[in-house]
């Protein structure tokens, strides 16, 4: 029999447990002896080069930047948390000592929970330091809203679960290889969960924190819906309780009847919480501004967030955006001025430019020129300077101009992607001419055979139309715009 198999020192049945002060001293001792702080330099480097760098590429919007906590920072922590927790769980067996068994008058299960708590506290401290840096920088840049805490709570709950799983693996399978295997297993589990959950709406996908990717303007026009976050917390905390209760099962845990009954109650409560979360998530439905779980949903979150628009002027036309996009306004007005000057006073020219919600589930909120007087309704991407789509400031400017010109010439009244000109050949030629005079470099689509020849004809007509004096172009558009929009103008009829 090895030293670690030896039963804990028996306690008199009438003796009381150790005082809370002794438990605090044990926790302090475990905090000092924990291996997690040695991982912080590596985690700090990962934070700077992955989550923080990604977040700084987004606009200064709280919910959008907070998304990196769950889909970037959390996966970076997974490997280290599971590995260190397994290392701490197998520490006593690897050393073949009884020092921790004799160091406390409490049952071994209590000592194990204290070691796990110390590891988890260090993990939480490191994670919250990263959150503080990210939120601190965002607070110095954001002009609207405040920090979202639901992603932080869900991330901490998942880290606690991973710590419990790693610690249990180290306790039940003590070996020098347990820690690296636990780290690898946690990483593969996270990777597989992300692969199977992204783009799906199943219960598994909704309960996976690493799949959270919000819309660009989440938390700006409408409230963040915490329904799924609440279900995730119930699920993760429930599983954590089950894993910790399982540590009381072995005889070496020295858990008497009372502690075993307490562990059983904890396990049942954890299973109930996890099962309830799964059941509630099964009733979830996707709405325009988030996922709703009826039992957990607060109807007050369905109301739009009131705000006062911030406006600028582009060629005498008001350009209004959400206050959070205040820093984007100069770039937007500068991009729209050369186009609005060319189409001023023409039929259908916008009298105002308004920002609308970026949401693929609401087609009516796409780019359009509609209303009386006409209003250019424009969804603005959250990252005009540098986006995940590779969009830079020049591309953002060209996209705004191309979208406005296409909507004006084609007369579209619905969703239009920011992109190259569309419509009939004559419409494309007019669009290219207007964009050329605005300083936008747009190429016509080419191709083999007839397609290439047609593109050359469009480009030639566009150059011919752009070479006209501004007054002549304006007068022709004023007289022929209705026929052009109806598709009755051919390339040969363009002046």
What does each model-identified segment do?
Residues 100-109:
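Short helix-to-coil transition segments within interhelical loops
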Residues 1-85, 91-92, 242-287, 293-320, ...:
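Hydrophobic alpha-helical transmembrane segments
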Residues 50-80, 85-87, 113-177:
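Secretory targeting signals
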Residues 187-252:
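Membrane-embedded alpha-helical segments of integral membrane proteins
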Residues 33, 170-179, 253-254:
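Membrane-helix interface "capping/anchor" motifs
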């Amino acid at each position: 029999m090895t030293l670690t198999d030896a039963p804990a020192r028996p306690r008199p049945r009438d003796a009381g447990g150790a005082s809370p002060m002794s438990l605090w001293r044990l926790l302090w001792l475990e905090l000092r002896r924990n291996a997690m702080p040695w991982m912080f330099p590596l985690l700090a480097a990962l934070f700077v080069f992955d989550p923080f760098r990604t977040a700084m590429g987004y606009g200064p919007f709280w919910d959008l930047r907070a998304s990196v906590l769950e889909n970037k920072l959390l996966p970076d922590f997974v490997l280290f948390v599971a590995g260190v927790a397994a290392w701490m769980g197998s520490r006593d067996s690897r050393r073949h000592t009884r020092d921790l068994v004799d160091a406390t008058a409490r049952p071994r299960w209590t000592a194990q929970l204290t070691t796990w708590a110390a590891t988890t506290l260090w993990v939480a401290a490191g994670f919250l330091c990263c959150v503080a840096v990210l939120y601190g920088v965002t607070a110095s840049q954001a002009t609207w809203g405040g920090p979202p805490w639901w992603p932080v709570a869900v991330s901490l709950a998942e880290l606690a679960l991973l710590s419990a799983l790693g610690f249990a693996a180290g306790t039940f399978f003590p070996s020098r290889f347990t820690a690296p295997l636990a780290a690898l297993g946690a990483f593969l589990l996270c990777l597989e969960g992300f692969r199977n959950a992204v783009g799906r709406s199943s219960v598994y996908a909704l309960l996976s924190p690493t799949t959270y990717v919000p819309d660009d303007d989440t938390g700006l026009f409408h409230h963040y819906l915490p329904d799924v976050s609440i279900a995730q917390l119930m699920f993760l905390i429930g599983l954590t309780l089950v894993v910790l209760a399982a540590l009381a099962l072995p005889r070496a845990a020295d858990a008497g009847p009372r502690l075993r009954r307490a562990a059983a109650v904890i396990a049942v409560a954890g299973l109930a919480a996890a099962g309830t979360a799964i059941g509630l998530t099964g009733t979830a439905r996707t709405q325009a501004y988030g996922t709703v779980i009826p039992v957990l949903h607060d109807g007050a979150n369905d109301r739009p967030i009131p705000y006062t628009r911030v406006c600028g002027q582009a060629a005498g036309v008001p350009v209004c955006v959400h206050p959070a996009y205040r820093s984007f306004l100069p770039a937007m007005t500068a991009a729209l001025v050369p186009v609005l000057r060319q189409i001023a006073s023409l039929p259908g020219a916008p009298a105002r430019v308004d920002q609308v919600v970026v949401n693929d589930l609401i087609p009516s909120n796409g780019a359009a020129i509609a209303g009386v007087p006409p209003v250019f309704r424009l969804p603005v991407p959250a990252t005009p300077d540098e986006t995940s789509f590779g969009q830079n400031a020049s591309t953002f400017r060209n996209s705004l101009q191309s979208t406005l010109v296409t909507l004006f010439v084609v007369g579209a009244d619905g969703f239009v992607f920011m992109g190259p000109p569309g419509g009939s050949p004559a419409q494309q030629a007019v669009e290219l001419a207007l964009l050329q005079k605005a300083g936008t470099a747009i190429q016509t689509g080419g191709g083999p055979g007839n397609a290439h020849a047609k593109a050359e004809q469009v480009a030639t007509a566009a150059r011919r139309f752009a070479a006209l004096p501004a007054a002549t172009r304006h007068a022709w558009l004023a007289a022929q715009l209705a026929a052009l929009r109806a598709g009755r103008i051919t390339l040969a009829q363009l002046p």
